[in-house]
Structures are given as structure tokens and as C-alpha cells.
Amino acid sequence: MITLMGCGSKEGELETNTKVTESEVKETTQNNTKENDMSEVTFDYTTLDDGTLSIWSYNAENVPEVFEIPEEIDGQTVSEIRGSLFASEDKIKEVIILETVTSIGKETFQLATSIEKIEIRGNVEELGDYAFFACKGIKELRFNEGLKYIGKSAISNNDNLTDLYLPSTVEDVSGTTNFGSQSDILRIHVPAGSAAESLVTDAVKDADCNIEVIAE
């Protein structure tokens, strides 16, 4: 049982009204638009054998704080991100990966320092080696059903990562170096009774850090 405690205003407590001017609202809207503006971002990519695109770099004079991977470029579907796309990133705070992406390649987010949130909306099937290695700002990672392969040290050395959600579809966790070297406890959530539960439990049994596998 988990007991939750919250804080709120007491009954009868006076509310404070804050007057917001029209200019303040306009300025806030403009700032939010600038932070999320992808209009000036261009990408370097490769066309794969199936005709879909693999993005490996981006170009932008003004880097948006919220960065969205497009579903398509010039009518071609984006299925992969790779090649240190966000490696050592120090400006972007949030990355949104849309539904078409099925592969996050080698070293894609390695050593990113500014990224605090990664939202994966689709069914990513594989994580390349060191894909999320030493991403210092990430506290939570969630993968949807469909993830099958987790490469060597793909999720490792993330000092602030406390919760990792893996689906029942995980079939291969490459090596025991995954999930290691967290500074505090890492809770790995997996579906109870799934093959993923056994795989992950086996992968972390000799880990040199505090990892808890939670079957739910």
C-alpha cells in the first residue's frame, strides 16, 4: 500500500488574486512559441532500403527547448534516429519522438546534459548500444509495447534516472552492463510474469548499484 500525502489550502483561507496584464500574456505566449519553434530546424538524414529515413543530425541557429522528431520529411517517413543526434546535447530540455520512429540507434542521446524529459509516443523496437548512456538530466524513461532489443549499455550511467518502464515484449538485453552505475535506487517496472521480467532480473543480478525490479 502506498500512502500519499498532499498539501493544499486550508478551508477558509483567503485566495490571492494576481492581475496579469495583456502584455505579459503576449510575452509569455511569444516565449513559449520560440521555445517550441521547429520551423528553422533542418535535418541530415539517410534513406534506408525500405524508403524510410534515418535522421543522424540536426541544424538550427536557435535551438528549441522542446524538440520534436518529425513523422516525415518531404513526404518520406522517419523510422530511425541515430548517429549521436543528441549526443552531448546542452540546450534542448525535452525531446518528443513521434509514432513512426521504431529504432533509436547507437549513441543517440549519449552524454546529453540538458535533456530532462524524453517522450516516446510510438512503438520503438530497438535501442542501439549506448543509446541513453550517461544522460544526466533524465529521471524517467517509458517504452511502449513493441520494444524487443536493448543494446549494450543502452540505458546506463544515468545518475538521476529513478524509474524505467519496460514492456512485456523485451526479448534481448545485451550484456549485464545495462542499467548499471546509478547514483541512487533505480526502479525498473516490468509486467508481472512476462519474459521481460526474467530477462531484466537476470541482467541486473550482479549489478554494482541499487536496482529494484518491480513486477506489476
Predicted regions and their residues:
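C-terminal motif of bacterial Sec signal peptides marking the signal peptidase cleavage site
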Residues: 3-6
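Short, aromatic/basic amphipathic alpha-helical patches
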Residues: 177, 195-210
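Short secondary-structure subsegments characteristic of cysteine-rich extracellular domains
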Residues: 1, 86-89
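Alpha-helix boundary recognition
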Residues: 87, 110, 133, 156, ...
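Consensus positions within tandem repeat domains that build extended binding/scaffold surfaces
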Residues: 83-85, 105-108, 128-131, 151-154, ...
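Short beta-strand/loop segment at the start of cytosolic alpha/beta domains
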Residues: 31-59
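N-terminal, intrinsically disordered, polar/charged segments of Gram-positive cell-envelope systems
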Residues: 11-40
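Structural signature of tandem-repeat unit edges
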Residues: 42-51, 62-79, 90-103, 113-126, ...
